Amino acid sequence: MELVVKSVAAASVKTATLVVPVGEGRKLGAVAKAVDLATDGAISAVLKRGDLAGKPGQTLLLQNLPGLKAERVLLVGSGKDEALGDRAWRKLVASVAGVLKGLNGSDAVLALDDIAVSNRDAHYGKYRLLAETLLDGEYVFDRFKSQKAEPRALKKITLLADKAGLTEVERAARHATAIATGMAFTRDLGNLPPNLCHPSYLAEQAKELGKAHKGLKVEVFDEKKIKDLGMGAFYAVGQGSEQPPRLIVLQYQGAKKSDKPFVLVGKGITFDTGGISLKPGAGMDEMKYDMCGAASVFGTLRAVLELKLPINLVCILACAENMPSGNATRPGDIVTTMSGQTVEILNTDAEGRLVLCDALTYAERFKPQAVIDIATLTGACIVALGSHTAGLLGNNDELIGQLLDAGKRADDRAWQLPLFDEYQEQLDSPFADIANIGGPKAGTITAACFLSRFAKAYNWAHLDIAGTAWVSGGKDKGATGRPVPLLTQYLLDRASA
């Protein structure tokens, strides 16, 4: 769907559907008053009948009003005089989108300048959230359905903005479009079945991205190279599978070669049975989403490429399939990581940290400004934070603050958990330098403590997206595309710093 931004009078636009807000108590803002005046009071007359209370997200569709070039006018409730919060604003936009999808019009014009959103400026902040909501709502995954979704009539939405804010709303639409593209790519990868989306498939996706963007350097390391690099922990995870592991490295140079890069490291476990420490069968199909960390790095890179951000970015994807077999890693095995530290593998279902630790060591060679790893790492994070916010831990307060701020502004929030030294003791092993699990307490924190031992050479943060990367069960089941908005916002901020 195309997003267009214009600065024209709402009452004069020719469109299939004009969307206008109405406050509670039938209050009309400046835009609605102008449209009402053009219709000789037709909107006021309808409102007096009490068909629309004006509560946020309520809608009323009017046809063929006099004095307008718009075929329809969709009134949407905007609530009381106070500004809407992000959640209410998203719900309002989604309500409008739901009505528009059911109409046969090919275009719509949204005249929503009169609605204020708390903690967001009237132009960029408000309209970026609107545009992302509209575009993300267009996502459909029906690749494996014999009956595809019907093509939607709606092809274009025009956002009306005042002249003073036109440039900022255009910027918001451009950024939102790039983020939505990245989220859709992330969701596609996550939703693919694991018999198709395995480590080699992700490697092919990286190569295709490299072909489409000539400035993108792509390297794919096979299992022999992974072993030769000394990545004993990473290699151990994939050795039980017929699908060989792959380390994928993508380098984007948007700034001077001498500028230190930002590094994103993604966990790419394309299917996680738990290995010899086998998971329960119920719900195991959702373990195809255990590669959503890697998928979100792919999606963020797509957004960065589309926006041509003036930064240097390295993306490292540690991809493997965790399967039980006669060759699989056993509980009690000890492996040597690329850093030289030894790990006693007490639970083969704590495999994400094993692929990530070697990838984090590999990241040192890029002398990064900051490294962020993204992983569906612990069920404990879902217990602690649910599905609304990602867990965030790290070794640098400034980096943590930047990510928290980016999450708030992108409406893709994270929440900081502690990384106190006392938790490190839970990882002590009598036989190796470190155990790969720390017992039942503070599972998200001890997993991050494990990773922190491999991230001492740089500023590092860890995003645990186990609760936010996908929706379980029901009609809405599927990958969410998070945390692409948070990560892209963080990089946008660094690009403009």
Curated annotation (Swiss-Prot):
It is found in: Cytoplasm. The lineage of its organism: Bacteria, Pseudomonadati, Pseudomonadota, Gammaproteobacteria, Pseudomonadales. This is Probable cytosol aminopeptidase. The gene is pepA. Mn(2+) 1 binds at residues 272, 349, 351. GO terms for cellular component: cytoplasm. HAMAP family: Cytosol_peptidase_M17 (MF_00181). GO terms for molecular function: manganese ion binding; metalloaminopeptidase activity. The active site is at residues 279, 353. Presumably involved in the processing and regular turnover of intracellular proteins. Catalyzes the removal of unsubstituted N-terminal amino acids from various peptides.
